[in-house]
Curated annotation (Swiss-Prot):
Protein family (similarity comment): Belongs to the triosephosphate isomerase family.
InterPro entries to which the protein is assigned, alphabetical: Aldolase_TIM, TIM_sf, TrioseP_Isoase_bac/euk, Triosephosphate_isomerase, Triosephosphate_isomerase_AS
Naturally occurring in which organism (per UniProt): Chlamydia trachomatis serovar D (strain ATCC VR-885 / DSM 19411 / UW-3/Cx)
SUPFAM superfamilies: Triosephosphate isomerase (TIM)
Lineage: Bacteria, Pseudomonadati, Chlamydiota, Chlamydiia, Chlamydiales
Chain residues that bind substrate: N31, W32, K33, G194, S234, G255, G256
CDD domains the record matches: TIM
HAMAP family, A to Z: TIM_B
Keywords of the record: Cytoplasm, Gluconeogenesis, Glycolysis, Isomerase
Protein's name according to its UniProt entry: Triosephosphate isomerase
Residues the record marks as active site: H118, E188
Gene: tpiA
Any one GO molecular function term: triose-phosphate isomerase activity
PROSITE patterns: TIM_1, TIM_2
Subunit: Homodimer.
């Protein structure tokens, strides 16, 4: 672990600057989930960091490794344009919570942002909206950016309940944040994650526009306009461009396709910048 964090501070724009700058920036985050050993991560980053594709200042790239790789990845990306994310956090700062990791711990090792409420956390580990609200607040208070993940199941989508589900997830999940908080939203329809099914760009745009309107009602029009809203769900190089062309899509949350540096770079290369 570094003893002098100032000497390893990334020489790139801060999160606050990125989230308050022009809205044309696109964010592309790769969620590794429960994958990669240390050796595999080192191999990935060696080829990934050296790519010229990452030189576009309008595209903000982040990787989200498992907890065991965060420190090593932080050292590897500290002098690169790549930001570091965590897959979840506990809502408490410390305590008798065996197996958990807190937001201050993540911030201490250089994590920039943290996923809150990924669909696998919601549906496999039964994380509920009120707890996710506490986790989002914990991330903010520790100096990280929460990426609140929301989405509906296939049954909910087919019954026409998508907007009701998302409204509840947004209203509760963001309820503990300060009025001027900076956060990122990720819409990931559960039926599209890891299934090969991709939401049609028209549906994605409609849903993202609804989310932005909801953020405006919960916070302000200004915050809604500057909040990046990402799409996640079977994102690949052959659909990344069409998704990024949606006016209210500000980036992509990539799952399995981000495990290969070649595939992930191909996706980033397809991102459309106005």
């Amino acid at each position: 672990m570094f003893t002098d964090k100032e000497t390893h501070r990334k020489p790139f724009p801060t999160w606050a600057h990125l989230l308050h700058s022009e809205p044309s920036k696109q964010f592309v985050f790769g969620n590794w989930k429960m994958n990669k050993t240390l050796t595999e991560a080192q191999t990935f980053l060696k080829s990934f960091i050296s790519s010229d594709i990452l030189s576009n200042p309008q595209i903000i790239t982040g990787i989200i490794p498992p907890f065991t790789l965060l420190s090593a990845c932080q050292q590897a990306v500290s002098d690169s344009p790549i930001f570091l994310g965590a897959q979840t956090t506990h809502e408490a700062d410390s305590g008798a919570f065996t197996g958990e990791i807190s937001a201050p711990m993540l911030k201490d090792i250089g994590v920039d942002f943290v996923l809150i409420g990924h669909s696998e956390r919601r549906h496999i580990f039964h994380e509920q909206n009120p707890v996710l609200a506490e986790k989002a607040a914990a991330a903010i208070h520790s100096g990280m950016i929460p990426v609140l993940c929301i989405g509906e199941t296939l049954e909910e989508q087919e019954s026409g309940a998508t907007q009701d589900i998302l409204l509840n997830q947004l209203t509760t999940g963001l309820s503990k944040l300060p009025e001027q908080a900076s956060f990122i939203l990720a819409y990931e329809p559960v039926w599209a994650i890891g299934t090969g099914k991709v939401a049609h760009p028209d549906l994605v745009q409609e849903t993202h526009a609804f989310c932005r309107k909801t953020i405006a009602s919960l916070f302000s029009k200004d915050i809604a306009e500057r909040t990046p809203i990402l799409y996640g769900g079977s994102v690949k190089a052959d659909n990344a461009r069409s998704l990024s062309l949606c006016p209210d899509v500000n980036g992509l949350l990539v799952g399995g396709a981000s495990l290969s540096s070649e595939n992930f770079l191909s996706i980033i290369q397809q991102i459309d910048i106005p």
